[in-house]
Amino acid sequence: MADVVLDLYAEDLDKDFAGQAQDEFGGDGVDLYDDIGGPTESAASGGGGGGTPSADGAAGPGSGEPGERNSGGPNGVYHQSSGSLTPTMNRRYQLYVGNLTWWTTDQDIANSLRDIGVSDLQEVKFFENRANGQSKGFSVISLGSESSLRAVLDQLPKKEMHGQAPVVTYPSKQALTQFESLQKTRPVPPPQQNGPPRGPAPPSMGGGPMPTGHPGGPQGGGPPGHPPRGMNSIMQPGQYRPQHMSQVPQVGGPNSGPPRMQPPMHPQGGLMGNQQPPPRYPSAQGQWPGQRPGGPRPGPPNGPPQRPMFQGGPMGMPVRGPAGPDWRRPPMHGGFPPQGPPRGLPPAPGPGGPHGAPAPHVNPAFFNQPGGPAQHPGMGGPPHGAPGPQPGMNMPPQQGMNMTPQHGPPPQFAQHGPRGPWPPPQGKPPGPFPDPQQMGPQLTEVEFEEVMSRNRTVSSSAIARAVSDAAAGEYSSAIETLVTAISLIKQSKVAHDERCKILISSLQDTLHGIEAKSYNRRERSRSRERSHRSRQRRERSTSRYRERSRERERDRDRERERDGGSYRERSRSRERERQAPDHYRDDSRSVRPRKSPEPVVAEAAEAPSSKRYYEDRERYRSSDRERRDRDRDRDRERERDRDRREEHRSRH
């Protein structure tokens, strides 16, 4: 698009830009423009500005052109209605309100509008993250009249909401893209910002077309209402693109002065003096997303306030642009060369541009990409890549620069809700950004060698002492010495060096060897203890066996003695039993008469003897049975005692 001449008053201007919309905005990670289908409005000269179709928000007429709301899309896509400037019945006046905290509600906006005298607010729609539903910090409002639109443009930036001054702009795709990029970017400035600017000063603002992405200046020759394309890589992340450049008519050649020149604005004093600083953005209560609190101050702007400048533009060269209705805003630092009027500014940064830190109302879990270099503080811009004001926006009043916001979310907004812990409104933003104070200064060669020699001494002495302690059997002392030396070397300033890593590895090898030796010694001592215990067990078992054998022998002897005594008693009883009949027989013979007695007398004499025999025999048997029972009980008791003694010995 750099070498294409555009007809500013063509009705089919959208055909020229239809093929460029996806190329320009599709790579920014913003997929909210798929439903854009409405034709763009023809740009008007003078006070009427031509808007571009916007997505996810509202149509952007330069002077409150009506926009028709389409309910399609996740956030509600707004299309611009083509037509003339004549009012219609369905006419809606819409504006973007940005730089809001994530906890700002539609009621807060309604109250602020009521305070400035606007009572015909129709709708407030916030832009939210699709992943967690959190507010992105900007919204689109619909008003009922053009007078209310003008009042909001002029007075709402002076009205703070939750400690931040809102930014009001006409709805356009460029403003929407800028709001989206500001809540996605997070620049991380290096510790020292003393480098030169990143490009030469642009030779002229009104010349012919320049190559796409040239770092020295913008492309000239584009229409006033549409900035040149293909310059996403040369714009600072925190800078806005002007929205309504059609209010600056082009008169004269490239080197001629701009028409309708206004007197320059007078400076209001430097930041270091006692006077008020020049009105610039961002404010103290509402820092722009991307500015980190506590950063370095910019250089004192001793010259007159200046307009937004390009990357690498010169300092101290103000631009006296027209002061139309869209230019009623405070100046900012940085500027263009005064050779010609600003005929076009580059668009917002593309996907390759530097990224910035999230604002307090942005969830940082979605934006962890590393940041690029920020703007030089001496170039006049806000520190750490903070954006300058956009010419299509009304800026807040004069406020300080380096104060952190002292406002937080109200109690009803739980910062640890179901959508994750939100970041606090002030302080250092979370993320994998190293602290410059923790990085440490670079060591000189002399300091490096001194630290390395100290580490070598520590390593050699630790190894020698550990080896001597290990040889003496003091393994715990040797291990402690090596561990201490390893920790000391790792904490030194040159621990990342390869030579230092070699020292650490040698110490670790020595430590592993000593630990292995200490483990082997413990195992040997344990094995000796085990062998001693097993020997004791064997001796104990042999002694038990001997005792048991002796007890068995004693038991056998007792049994033999018992058996011998019982046998003798039995033999005696048998002898008595044999002798008893003979005795009875002899008695009977001596008593018996010569005559054979009568049978009755004989039976009476024999009956007592036989009865006595059986009684004696029964008595002997019972006594023998009792004796055997006693011996059996005694043997059982002896066996029980023996078992008890065995159990007691086995336990001990």
Curated annotation (Swiss-Prot):
Belongs to the RRM CPSF6/7 family. Residues 93-173 form the RRM domain. Residues 187-203, 256-266, 295-307, 338-352, 420-435 have a biased composition (Pro residues). Coiled coil: none annotated. Pfam families: RRM_1 (PF00076). This is Cleavage and polyadenylation specificity factor subunit 6. May play a role in pre-mRNA 3'-processing. InterPro entries: CPSF6/7, CPSF6_RRM, Nucleotide-bd_a/b_plait_sf, RBD_domain_sf, RRM_dom. The gene is Cpsf6.
